[in-house]
Structures are given as structure tokens and as C-alpha cells.
Regions:
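Acidic (Asp/Glu-rich) sequence patches and key acidic residues
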Residues: 1-150
Length: 150
């Protein structure tokens, strides 16, 4: 099952270098592949998290399509841009998508919509979620090791 996040904003970053700088300002251990121009993002975006290969699907979406696809969601205002993040069940993909989305939202003055929860998060809330994910990773890894032993 794929999960999705969306960054809603009124501005866009101009380059992958600009996005990476936003990630670096948050001191996230995430490196995005900078070969694809940010304006051409569509599909899987390779990344490295703490030196391990990972990534997530990422692309620009029309605002109208995004809003129309969520009739029960209420947004406090109209936004100009939507950047979509999608990943499967891999925990590194989850963590890297949240880090990348939080940094992008902060750099563009945007917010994050979590499709699973049907909830909009401020940048501050998104940064807390990233910290929660980072704190839970050792427990998740231990649980997965225990499952493999059984």
C-alpha cells in the first residue's frame, strides 16, 4: 500500500541544490539525487539516508486535481502549488519522504497534508513528526530483527 504526503505552497524551490540546502539547514542526514531538475520531478527520486540508498516518488501535481480528489478535506486557504511524495512500506522511504517534505515546506512557507490522516500539518508539526520517526527507528529495527529470528 502506498502512502502519500503533499506539500502545499505558494512558492516553489528553483533547484535541487536549493532543496538540498533546506534539508541541510535542518541537519537531516538525507542527500537527494540532484541529477533530475526540480521542475521535471516525476517518479522515483533516489536519495541517501545515513549513507543507505533509499528514495521516494515525487512530482508536481495540479492543485485543482489535488483538492477535487479530497472532497472531505478542508483547507484554510487556496494554495498555488502541490508537491506530491509517495512511498511504500519501507521505513527509510517513510523517513526520507517526511524529511524532504518538511524541509521543502519550511523553505517555501507551505504546509504538509498527510493523506493517511486526512490532516494538514504545520512545518513545526512536521518537524516533530520527523523527530518521532527518528526516535522510533531503533525500536522498529529491533522488532524486525526479532521477527526474522522467529
Amino acid at each position: 500500500m502506498a502512502m502519500e504526503l503533499f506539500v502545499l505552497s505558494d512558492t516553489q524551490l528553483n533547484s535541487m541544490d536549493e532543496w538540498q540546502a533546506a534539508i541541510d539547514r535542518e541537519r537531516f542526514p538525507l542527500r537527494l539525487n540532484s541529477e533530475t531538475p526540480i521542475s521535471a520531478l516525476k517518479g522515483f527520486l533516489p536519495a541517501s539516508l545515513r549513507g543507505n540508498a533509499t528514495g521516494f516518488e515525487c512530482g508536481h501535481s495540479p492543485v485543482e486535481v489535488f483538492v477535487r480528489g479530497r472532497p472531505r478535506a478542508s483547507f484554510d486557504r487556496a494554495w498555488r502549488y502541490v508537491l506530491t511524495f509517495r512511498w511504500g512500506g519501507d521505513f527509510r522511504e517513510l523517513e526520507s519522504a517526511w524529511m524532504a517534505a518538511a524541509a521543502y515546506a519550511k523553505a517555501t512557507g507551505g504546509v504538509i497534508f498527510d493523506d493517511e490522516e486526512g490532516k494538514t500539518h504545520t512545518v513545526a508539526e512536521a518537524l516533530e513528526i520527523v523527530q518521532d520517526i527518528e526516535r522510533s527507528m531503533p525500536k522498529v529495527k529491533e522488532l524486525l530483527r526479532d521477527i526474522k529470528r522467529v
